[in-house]
């Protein structure tokens, strides 16, 4: 679009003249194309008569063009320097510089000159191939964009300087020059003046007159013949300028300015980083946008630029709980509903007090040819009401092949409104090898689609695929139950993979001084090094059965940018080798008793929020930090032993392989 020209200053008559020129140019081009086709056909005819291909074997006694026998000893034969074929003297064309070519090669050169191909072959390497007529035609079709910060006064002044705005203005001006015509503004029955009534219908009038004039000009050019099929209404300008009309009211030239602006007005919270800088100083100071300005200027704050702020999953869950608590207090109801956040991260949060009832009917079949699991969701029976007072439910079914709970692994049916016995009859597919299917668990969950995305959990059911026979498509019906807690021993296995890490604490006495290492703020304390080696058997988050994973770390209780560390993204693998080290300075040995290292694995999504793949927490696992009970001090098993080994042997590496958690919600401690 950068090649388009600004032709807004042209009048409709001038545009019609330009379009007629373009039409003649199109006719000339078609005639020239016909001439070029004729020349190319002549060349093809010469080749068909006697030319041979380079892939064939040529006899030394035959001319490649006329195929005449040359005899055993023929001094007239020689090789054409264009095609390397043997040709006789009669099939040569002498050139001005004394050299010669065969008839076919000479005809090809002549054709290249006559058609102008030599010019276009060079032009295509230097310029984008687009003729001037195409650019002008596209510019005439293109409607100029309105400046975002152009005021009404500036636009009026610009239009006055550029000339006519709409075609009927000349006719109106001629009518105004006549002394017999009086300009009156009568009152209507509604009490409004005709000018006020006209201004109210200004949007529709402007759209009709503009579209009609544009259609007329393009119909004359013949560029859009299909527009002729559409019946266009008569212009209001023609109606108002007809003789005998009473109380004619003419609209001022600024009518285009007062059209309703469809551009969205941004609230302060919706400004982009660069827009925030352009707000008044009082607004900038109130929002404290020093960090915003540093983000909008490249190189001003490199650390902030590198931080691609994906939301932490626990932080999102915490905010969602607070939001639900506030809404329940305001409504005076103790019933808490679950929002779309729970749809993404189903293991966290409160699932409400709805009593789960009903069952789901379905059938399963595995297609060997396509390597796909076919899930036929048929119907649900006797579901619970999401809104008990109004006896209303809008249910839909969502499925996962656990442990994969990513967006790519989610399948959903349509929403059936105002029913507790929905009939779906829909097919959901999962492309997965049969060998891997036995390690998965198919989960059905039924949800009520509420207003504003506040979905309510209605029940779920699971199928262990290792004990399911898929050779025949049989109908099944399972009862729905409530959410199984992650702490419940009867919970389904959720293997998320393993993370291999090594920890080392270097006391302050052994920490190197000087060099490029930053000095800690406290002036004392050692150094905690976290070596993220690799991950094994991660959950596939992308369609191809892979993940673009990275590890993010926090040294709790500090959950801020100073404590945040990230590894590079390892693409298209479920067994990534990170080989990356996190370093925390200014850490004292006695402080490790009250700290916890949280490592989470994420799948990188460039245009959306990242997918949670699993995580671990390394600490003492007492549930207490600095005398306070905290949720994040919940380490168990290998997480505790690896942390204690690192504390027990300062200066040496402590390595361990940790099972990734499927949820970073608080675990039940064996106290």
UniProtKB/Swiss-Prot annotation:
Keyword 4Fe-4S: no
Domain (RabBD): residue spans on this chain: 4-122
Gene3D superfamilies, sorted: C2 domain (2.60.40.150), Zinc/RING finger domain, C3HC4 (zinc finger) (3.30.40.10)
Membrane topology value: Peripheral membrane protein
Chain segments carrying region Disordered: 199-243
SMART domains linked to this entry: C2 (SM00239)
Cross-referenced PROSITE patterns: C2 (PS50004), RABBD (PS50916)
Example GO molecular function: neurexin family protein binding
Keywords assigned: Cell membrane, Cytoplasmic vesicle, Membrane, Metal-binding, Phosphoprotein, Repeat, Zinc, Zinc-finger
Domain of life: Eukaryota
FYVE-type zinc-finger residues: 63-105
Location(s) in or outside the cell: Membrane; Cell membrane; Cytoplasmic vesicle, Secretory vesicle membrane
GO cellular component: endosome; exocytic vesicle; plasma membrane; platelet alpha granule membrane; transport vesicle membrane
One example of a Gene Ontology biological process annotation: positive regulation of exocytosis
Keyword Zinc-finger: yes
Residues annotated as domain C2: 356-478, 507-633
Residues that bear Phosphoserine: 201, 204, 217, 221, 274, 289, 488
Pfam families with a match to the protein in the record: C2, FYVE_2
Protein task: Modulates exocytosis of dense-core granules and secretion of hormones in the pancreas and the pituitary. Interacts with vesicles containing negatively charged phospholipids in a Ca(2+)-independent manner.
Assembly and binders: Part of a ternary complex containing STX1A and RAB27A. Can bind both dominant negative and dominant active mutants of RAB27A. Binds STXBP1, RAB3A, RAB8A and RAB27B. Interacts with MYO5A.
UniProt protein name: Synaptotagmin-like protein 4
Organism: Homo sapiens
Gene this protein is translated from: SYTL4
């Amino acid at each position: 679009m950068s090649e388009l020209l600004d032709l807004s200053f042209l009048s409709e008559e001038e545009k019609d003249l330009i379009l007629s020129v373009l039409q003649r140019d199109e006719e000339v081009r078609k005639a020239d194309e016909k001439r070029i086709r004729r020349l190319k056909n002549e060349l093809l005819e010469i080749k068909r008569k006697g030319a041979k291909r380079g892939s064939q074997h040529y006899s030394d006694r035959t001319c490649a063009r006329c195929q005449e026998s040359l005899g055993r000893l023929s001094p007239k034969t020689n090789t054409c320097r264009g095609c390397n074929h043997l040709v006789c003297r009669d099939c040569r064309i002498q050139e001005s510089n004394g050299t010669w070519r065969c008839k076919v090669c000479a005809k090809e050169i002549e054709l290249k000159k006559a058609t102008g191909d030599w010019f276009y072959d060079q032009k295509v390497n230097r310029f984008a191939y687009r003729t001037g007529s195409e650019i002008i035609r596209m510019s005439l079709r293109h409607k100029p964009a309105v400046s975002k910060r152009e005021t009404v006064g500036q636009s009026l002044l610009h239009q006055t300087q550029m000339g006519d705005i709409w075609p009927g203005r000349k006719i109106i001006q001629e009518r105004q020059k006549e002394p017999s015509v009086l300009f009156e503004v009568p009152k209507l029955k509604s009490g409004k003046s005709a000018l006020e009534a006209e201004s109210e219908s200004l949007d529709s009038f402007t759209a009709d007159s503009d579209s009609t004039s544009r259609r007329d000009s393009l119909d004359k050019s013949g560029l859009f013949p299909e527009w002729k099929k559409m019946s266009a209404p008569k212009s209001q300008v023609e109606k108002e300028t007809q003789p005998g009309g009473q109380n004619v009211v003419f609209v001022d030239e600024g009518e285009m300015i007062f059209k309703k602006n469809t551009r969205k007005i941004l609230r302060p919270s919706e400004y982009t980083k660069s827009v925030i800088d352009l707000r008044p100083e009082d607004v900038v100071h109130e929002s404290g946008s020093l960090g915003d300005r540093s983000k909008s200027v490249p190189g001003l704050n490199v650390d902030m630029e590198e931080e691609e702020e994906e939301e932490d999953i626990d932080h999102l869950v915490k905010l969602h709980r607070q939001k639900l608590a506030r809404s329940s207090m305001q409504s005076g109801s103790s019933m808490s509903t679950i929002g779309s956040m729970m749809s993404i991260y189903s293991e966290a949060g409160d699932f409400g007090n709805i009593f789960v009832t009903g069952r789901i009917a379905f059938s399963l079949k595995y297609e060997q040819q396509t390597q796909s699991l076919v899930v036929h969701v048929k119907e649900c029976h006797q579901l619970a009401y999401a809104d008990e007072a109004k006896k209303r439910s809008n249910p839909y079914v969502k499925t996962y092949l656990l442990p994969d709970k990513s967006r790519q692994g989610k399948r959903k049916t349509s929403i059936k409104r105002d029913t507790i016995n929905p009939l779906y009859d829909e097919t959901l597919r999962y492309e997965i090898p049969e060998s891997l299917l036995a390690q998965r668990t198919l989960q059905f969950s039924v949800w009520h689609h509420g207003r504003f995305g506040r979905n309510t959990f209605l029940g779920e059911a699971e199928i262990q695929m290792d004990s399911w026979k898929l050779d025949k498509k049989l109908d099944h019906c399972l009862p729905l139950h409530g959410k199984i807690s992650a702490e419940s021993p009867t919970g389904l296995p959720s293997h998320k993979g393993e993370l291999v890490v090594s920890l080392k604490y270097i006391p302050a006495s052994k920490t190197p001084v000087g060099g490029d290492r930053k000095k800690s703020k406290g002036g004392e304390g050692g150094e905690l090094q976290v070596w993220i080696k690799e991950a094994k058997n991660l959950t596939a988050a992308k369609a191809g059965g892979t993940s673009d994973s990275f590890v993010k770390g926090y040294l709790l209780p500090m959950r801020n940018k100073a404590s945040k560390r990230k590894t590079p993204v390892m693409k298209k693998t479920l067994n990534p080798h990170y080989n990356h080290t996190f370093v925390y300075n200014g850490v004292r040995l006695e402080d490790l008793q009250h700290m916890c290292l949280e490592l989470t694995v994420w799948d990188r999504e460039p245009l959306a929020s990242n997918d949670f793949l699993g995580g671990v927490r390394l600490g003492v696992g007492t549930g207490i930090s600095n005398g306070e009970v905290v949720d994040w001090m919940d380490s168990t098993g290998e997480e505790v032993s690896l942390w204690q080994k690192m504390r027990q042997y300062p200066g040496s590496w402590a390595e361990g392989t940790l099972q990734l958690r499927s949820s970073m919600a608080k675990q039940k401690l064996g106290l």
